[in-house]
Amino acid sequence: MAGTLDLDKGCTVEELLRGCIEAFDDSGKVRDPQLVRMFLMMHPWYIPSSQLAAKLLHIYQQSRKDNSSSLQVKTCHLVRYWISAFPAEFDLNPELAEQIKELKALLDQEGNRRHSSLIDIENVPTYKWKRQVTQRNPVEQKKRKMSLLFDHLEPLELAAHLTYLEYRSFCKILFQDYHSFVTHGCTVDNPVLERFISLFNSVSQWVQLMILSKPTAPQRAGVITHFVHVAEELLHLQNFNTLMAVVGGLSHSSISRLKETHSHVSPETIKLWEGLTELVTATGNYGNYRRRLAACVGFRFPILGVHLKDLVALQLALPDWLDPARTRLNGAKMKQLFSILEELAMVTSLRPPVQANPDLLSLLMVSLDQYQTEDELYQLSLQREPRSKSSPTSPTTCTPPPRPPVLEEWTSAAKPKLDQAIMVEHIEKMVESVFRNFDVDGDGHISQEEFQIIRGNFPYLSAFGDLDQNQDGCISKEEMVSYFLRSSSMLGGRMGFVHNFHESNSLRPVACRHCKALILGIYKQGLKCRACGVNCHKQCKDRLSVECRRRAQSMSLEGSAPSPSPTHTHHRAFSFSLPRPGRRGSRPPEIREEEVQTVEDGVFDIHL
């Protein structure tokens, strides 16, 4: 740091600005780059960038009166450094850009071409894409044709695509997003950070749903094993953020309670799982993770939630200013904040060592917006292994690792609602990918045979005839796009999970799945779902939170569907497979384990 400044004792903004100017020599060489970069990155924490630009303009004008040519050129070197190091500020802040243009115009009027040439504000690239909630960047096609069936993806391939998706989303986060989160304590008016958080949550939920989508314990154990190896590959890629999401999904209560499932997981996998869980545990303020991160070389993706907690803790523990008049900023706090934010900023300077398949990304981007509540996940877990089921007698006595502490205040953020135009764009790209990979004969239409192949990725698609609107025996791109748009809007983002109720008589009392009270009488006082058999009172239909769990089978989208519960916020989603539960008995609290089905079991999707 500059010798004349003692940041630990505090200093004014003007003193720190002067110290940054004096850090340059007349040739533009900076003697204290850490001080300069820290102040230019951190100044919005204390004053708006427009005020800083005004101070620089004032210093330059004052140096002209004092005939201090050295101060003039040093000021211009600082402005050049600012534009070079943080160009997004100038593209996204028109007021700031205009002030710098004003300084450049002043230099031109004076005929000072040498100083003016140092300030290149006209060629700042656009960064408006950083403010868009979703953005698809072109990526190189892989030479070999990658399978679009999620079950066919090797752990490394899946880890690479997860890394690519999260990295692309992370690169849009700017300093102002971190500052807003720390000052507000939440993601209010912060859609970019909120979207990244929802992606983290989506990965965690997707892991749970992929496990719970399998009807038998050995199959679920196989999915757990697969995701443990995905987590291992994420560690090799030094992607700790997605590693935390995957481990969190594996250790969630809806999965950890599946005792029979865990009895089929090998001891070797359990040992690996325990090691990965221990790495991201909160013990010792995430000491294991911090040590591993510090030892990383090259690309690394830190756990954003951990570092956001650090920022919030600093904000609460230390004041921004050391005096009531707010003239002397807290330099010690600034240095600590900078060390955290600089670590996060380094992520965007190094690209991950992965390549992504555009078609697979399009499918994943659509499936990402599936949303399930904690209660819905737990209900599905109870369907798989009801509470009353006795523990299995098995030679394998493996138990799942304890669930790592969850960053509740961070991961519980609601999913931001995408606008219609963005949703249409994703659906169209997804449909293009489907036709490019599954239209075998290349005639621009999907035949019934090709449709059955597609169901490997979209098991909750309705019957072929529901998509074939003109009934010509094949499905066009327009018909498939129309189907997804219609389904998403009509079902409130819950495709494949909506009950198909009809009035039902019962010769004996049955319990309402919502209120648990008996449905009495034989005069059609109750409703029953044709697909899954769930019963409820007519007045309870709209409040029923249990979703229809029948497997992909013909069910018209025009059938009756309950209105979404006012207590739940539904977000758009697209249909993906969950296996069908077995027929319920007369005793409602429990659901018998379904029989193994010979039809396709569905593929990963639900929630990447």
Swiss-Prot record:
<keyword id="KW-0966">Cell projection</keyword>
<keyword id="KW-0863">Zinc-finger</keyword>
<dbReference type="InterPro" id="IPR046349">
    <property type="entry name" value="C1-like_sf"/>
</dbReference>
<feature type="binding site">
    <location>
        <position position="450"/>
    </location>
    <ligand>
        <name>Ca(2+) 1</name>
    </ligand>
</feature>
<dbReference type="InterPro" id="IPR001895">
    <property type="entry name" value="RASGEF_cat_dom"/>
</dbReference>
<feature type="domain" description="EF-hand 1">
    <location>
        <begin position="426"/>
        <end position="461"/>
    </location>
</feature>
<dbReference type="GO" id="GO:0005085">
    <property type="term" value="F:guanyl-nucleotide exchange factor activity"/>
</dbReference>
<keyword id="KW-0597">Phosphoprotein</keyword>
<dbReference type="GO" id="GO:0032587">
    <property type="term" value="C:ruffle membrane"/>
</dbReference>
<dbReference type="GO" id="GO:0007265">
    <property type="term" value="P:Ras protein signal transduction"/>
</dbReference>
<dbReference type="InterPro" id="IPR011992">
    <property type="entry name" value="EF-hand-dom_pair"/>
</dbReference>
<dbReference type="InterPro" id="IPR018247">
    <property type="entry name" value="EF_Hand_1_Ca_BS"/>
</dbReference>
<feature type="binding site">
    <location>
        <position position="468"/>
    </location>
    <ligand>
        <name>Ca(2+) 2</name>
    </ligand>
</feature>
<dbReference type="Pfam" id="PF00617">
    <property type="entry name" value="RasGEF"/>
</dbReference>
<feature type="binding site">
    <location>
        <position position="470"/>
    </location>
    <ligand>
        <name>Ca(2+) 2</name>
    </ligand>
</feature>
<keyword id="KW-0479">Metal-binding</keyword>
<feature type="binding site">
    <location>
        <position position="439"/>
    </location>
    <ligand>
        <name>Ca(2+) 1</name>
    </ligand>
</feature>
<dbReference type="InterPro" id="IPR008937">
    <property type="entry name" value="Ras-like_GEF"/>
</dbReference>
<feature type="modified residue" description="Phosphoserine">
    <location>
        <position position="147"/>
    </location>
</feature>
<dbReference type="GO" id="GO:0008270">
    <property type="term" value="F:zinc ion binding"/>
</dbReference>
<dbReference type="InterPro" id="IPR000651">
    <property type="entry name" value="Ras-like_Gua-exchang_fac_N"/>
</dbReference>
<feature type="domain" description="N-terminal Ras-GEF">
    <location>
        <begin position="4"/>
        <end position="126"/>
    </location>
</feature>
<dbReference type="InterPro" id="IPR002048">
    <property type="entry name" value="EF_hand_dom"/>
</dbReference>
<feature type="binding site">
    <location>
        <position position="445"/>
    </location>
    <ligand>
        <name>Ca(2+) 1</name>
    </ligand>
</feature>
<keyword id="KW-0677">Repeat</keyword>
<dbReference type="InterPro" id="IPR023578">
    <property type="entry name" value="Ras_GEF_dom_sf"/>
</dbReference>
<dbReference type="Pfam" id="PF00618">
    <property type="entry name" value="RasGEF_N"/>
</dbReference>
<feature type="region of interest" description="Disordered">
    <location>
        <begin position="382"/>
        <end position="407"/>
    </location>
</feature>
<feature type="modified residue" description="Phosphoserine">
    <location>
        <position position="575"/>
    </location>
</feature>
<feature type="binding site">
    <location>
        <position position="479"/>
    </location>
    <ligand>
        <name>Ca(2+) 2</name>
    </ligand>
</feature>
<dbReference type="GO" id="GO:0045202">
    <property type="term" value="C:synapse"/>
</dbReference>
<dbReference type="GO" id="GO:0043005">
    <property type="term" value="C:neuron projection"/>
</dbReference>
<feature type="modified residue" description="Phosphoserine">
    <location>
        <position position="554"/>
    </location>
</feature>
<feature type="binding site">
    <location>
        <position position="472"/>
    </location>
    <ligand>
        <name>Ca(2+) 2</name>
    </ligand>
</feature>
<dbReference type="GO" id="GO:0005829">
    <property type="term" value="C:cytosol"/>
</dbReference>
<feature type="modified residue" description="Phosphoserine">
    <location>
        <position position="116"/>
    </location>
</feature>
<feature type="modified residue" description="Phosphoserine">
    <location>
        <position position="117"/>
    </location>
</feature>
<keyword id="KW-0106">Calcium</keyword>
<keyword id="KW-0771">Synaptosome</keyword>
<comment type="subunit">
    <text>Forms a signaling complex with RAP1 and BRAF. Interacts with RAP1. Interacts with F-actin.</text>
</comment>
<comment type="similarity">
    <text>Belongs to the RASGRP family.</text>
</comment>
<keyword id="KW-0862">Zinc</keyword>
